[in-house]
């Protein structure tokens, strides 16, 4: 019988495979959510480089946020990663939600990144 971690890993790998197949070489906006913080990176898999990154632990956001674990923090991180990606010359990405459902903090981050100038 599979554990919860095994099932989560299988979901993540299945989604990553689909993104690689349909992504067409576009950078991916990868999201990691922990119990206390949220992290986002724009990754160029072809070159193997991180083009832009932001998290609720960034000094620019830490003073503004009450906690890094709510939707307000996700919105702030989404806007910041979009701003940094556009500054790096990236506007078209593929959204990699990992094994997480598109709901709550993940959805808030995605919508804020769209408002910030990223298209996916």
Curated annotation (Swiss-Prot):
The keyword GTP-binding does not apply. One of its GO terms (biological process) is translation. The keyword Ribosomal protein applies. GO terms for molecular function: 5S rRNA binding; structural constituent of ribosome. CDD domains: Ribosomal_L18_L5e. It holds the Pfam family Ribosomal_L18p. Keywords: Ribonucleoprotein, Ribosomal protein, RNA-binding, rRNA-binding. One of its GO terms (cellular component) is cytosolic large ribosomal subunit. InterPro entries: Ribosomal_uL18_bac-type, Ribosomal_uL18_bac/euk. HAMAP family: Ribosomal_uL18_B (MF_01337_B). Part of the 50S ribosomal subunit; part of the 5S rRNA/L5/L18/L25 subcomplex. Contacts the 5S and 23S rRNAs. This is one of the proteins that bind and probably mediate the attachment of the 5S RNA into the large ribosomal subunit, where it forms part of the central protuberance. Belongs to the universal ribosomal protein uL18 family. This is Large ribosomal subunit protein uL18. It comes from Gluconacetobacter diazotrophicus (strain ATCC 49037 / DSM 5601 / CCUG 37298 / CIP 103539 / LMG 7603 / PAl5). The gene is rplR.
